[in-house]
Amino acid sequence: MGYFYDTTEKILIEQYVSEHMGEIKSKITEEAVFEAGIDLLIAEPTPERPFRSLVTCGMGAIPLELPQYLSMHRINRAELVLHLSPEWQLKSRLDWPIRLMHWLSRLPLDDASLIRDLAIFELDAFLEHDNPYRAVMLHYCNECHLLDPFVRLPRKDRVIFMELIPLLPAELDYIEAHSAEEFLRDVHRFLPLAADQTRQPVTKQLSGE
């Protein structure tokens, strides 16, 4: 049994991304499709959103075990969003953001409960010379919730979008010393946080450094 969007569902996701995140200039189509077909959409920066966004299109075909306050409204599917600095040019399918998105988006095939708010995934397998981050934290897409909280599929299920918040070592230390909830509350005014080679830990601003 496989999990796949039909053409109409793909169009609905792409329309949502184009409207709320930026024009889709390119798409990375998955080469080997087995249990699920998950493409990556690249939304270009806009004046209102000065970063490039990498968005999955296909993970939402996999039903998730989301909290009851979501599932009771038939919100039981999700797509992932990773923001990148506008200067970031994705040159290869082997670039760590692309490999990371493909890896995370397939986790629900083994465990439908892994994709959840405030879940943290360490990036040991994705550490490279151009990757200063040590983990990512999932969070319900704040800007999406303010604008339009979900995509309604023809099958009646609803798809939400979850941001990947890239965590620098100091930020991961802050979470381990406090909690993911406290970190998110303290840095909320800085969201969304994009993957940026020059970004300094937001915890520096919290501590007044």
What annotation goes with each model-predicted range?
Residues 1-67, 71-75, 81-209:
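Acidic, proline/glycine-rich low-complexity IDRs
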